[in-house]
């Protein structure tokens, strides 16, 4: 019984670790989806001609309207600048995410934001966003399955099924997340090359949301591996106990699905009591591992109760004989 409790505690620990990793992955992926820091960089914008926002490099020269000398009565001021090459441009910071793209403004402090979906090519507009949303949805389903297994399930067979579904959902979520991240990178590169000319970045790099998304993918796959490990361990433990029963009773090899089945009807009654404590076990063969684990757990509980009653009987009988 102590061994069973240890195995149950070890399984609960693995389920808890898997749920924590899944919750961490879900939080990181949601934060990266809502962020506008996937890509950061600069935009090359022409400076206004000797405007107020230009720091310096402009000087005034008086010129006459009739083309004469500068000391005539009719004059105007002409502004000249000696800036050439990249000095004629301002490099403004920008950041872009799946929802918004924000650019620093030259006229006043602050930034101007617009929807990134409106900037992308129509053929690739919703593909990456849909994959990212499905990735988060599968993670949420996996987390709910693991949480149900951890908090509400005391049946080993039901817990085994929940672990299997959670593991499959986590693997699908991780693969879909990897595809979604790669798709968005391609969408951004296509937008940088084919998007509006007033938006195209001069240089760009990956932001913190990009790395957060890949950390989320790593946590998701780690949770999937932990859940699969837990599921495989439970199945192998059951098969090991099943094979030990074959060694104990070789006659069971012909019909191995009935090895754990007791007689069809067993009753424990006492004088003056109705036949209410009879236990009826199924006589049909076991068709799945989860059914076998359910039956094995029930038999273990029954054997434990019978062992306790036998020990009490051994303790009570000597005391009764001494009193006689």
Swiss-Prot record:
It holds the Pfam family GSG-1. Coiled coil: none annotated. Keywords: Endoplasmic reticulum, Membrane, Transmembrane, Transmembrane helix. This is Germ cell-specific gene 1 protein. It is found in: Endoplasmic reticulum membrane. One of its GO terms (cellular component) is endoplasmic reticulum membrane. Belongs to the GSG1 family. It comes from the Eukaryota. It is a multi-pass membrane protein. The lineage of its organism: Eukaryota, Metazoa, Chordata, Craniata, Vertebrata. May cause the redistribution of PAPOLB from the cytosol to the endoplasmic reticulum. It comes from Mus musculus (Mouse). GO terms for molecular function: RNA polymerase binding. Expressed in spermatogenic cells (at protein level). Expressed in germ cells within the testis from day 21 onwards. Interacts with PAPOLB. InterPro entries: GSG-1, PMP-22/EMP/MP20-like. The chain crosses the membrane at residues 15-35, 127-147, 164-184, 208-228.
